[in-house]
């Protein structure tokens, strides 16, 4: 039964996202706020099918903390693909710091470029690092939106606790902005690299 539910969910997930991304193609030449709308729409769509197909409820905690500061960046745990979409709901179109490879994915990568996402290289020189921080500052001043980074660098299993990458500390020092950490349990419902999805509440 769990396999059947997972199969139905994945069909709705991928075909639904492809449909939304195709609808969003014209937004690539429109203002960012229109593109961001479709990003949040895709997140809400996933939340909906999680509820309808998997009987999974998504609960956001601490959203009031986002209103206490004007400028900040968010450092989130990373257990599944889901939070890359879901965090667009409370953050309303964050600026992603992500692996360069993600920008090369058709449709998805185009959207990430349009909303001002910043690619990070695994191995960088000191000069490249300085240019990277300058780019972040410029992007934040221009867009007035929060920065979102996944300091673990990749998705991890629910019971794993790999060390955080040093980059988040460097960003914290370079930007001199408050950091809002995000804990979650998405790996319980949506395990890393797994076809199977499971029922249960998601807490972010």
Language-model regions: role of each:
Residues 21-32, 36-40, 53, 68-125:
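Catalytic core of membrane glycerolipid acyltransferases/transacylases, capturing the structured
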Residues 113-144:
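A membrane-cytosol interface segment of integral membrane proteins
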Residues 1-57:
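N-terminal membrane-anchoring alpha-helices
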Residues 71-73, 144-150:
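Residue-level preference for the first positions of well-ordered beta-strands
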Residues 53-61, 129-131, 187-189:
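Short gly/ser/thr-rich secondary-structure transition/capping motifs
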Residues 153:
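Active-site metal-binding loops of divalent metal-dependent hydrolases
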Residues 62-67:
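Glycine-rich helix-loop-beta junction characteristic of Rossmann-like nucleotide cofactor-binding loops
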């Amino acid at each position: 039964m769990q396999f059947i539910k997972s199969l139905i969910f994945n069909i709705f997930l991928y075909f639904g996202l492809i449909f939304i991304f195709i609808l969003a193609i014209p937004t690539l030449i429109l203002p960012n706020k229109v593109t961001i709308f479709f990003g949040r729409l895709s997140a809400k769509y996933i939340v909906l099918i999680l509820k309808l197909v998997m009987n999974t409820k998504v609960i956001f905690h601490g959203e009031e903390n986002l209103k206490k500061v004007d400028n900040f960046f968010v450092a989130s745990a990373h257990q599944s693909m889901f939070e890359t979409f879901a965090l667009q709901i409370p953050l309303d179109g964050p600026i992603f710091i992500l692996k360069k490879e993600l920008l090369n994915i058709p449709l998805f990568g185009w959207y990430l470029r349009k909303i001002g996402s910043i690619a990070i290289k695994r191995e960088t020189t000191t000069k490249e690092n300085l240019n990277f921080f300058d780019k972040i500052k410029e992007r934040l001043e221009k867009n007035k939106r929060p920065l979102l980074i996944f300091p673990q660098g990749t998705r991890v299993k629910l019971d794993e606790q790999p060390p955080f990458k040093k980059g988040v500390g460097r960003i914290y020092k370079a930007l001199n902005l408050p950091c809002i950490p995000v804990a979650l349990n998405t790996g319980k419902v949506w395990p890393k690299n797994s076809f199977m999805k499971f029922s249960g509440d998601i807490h972010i």
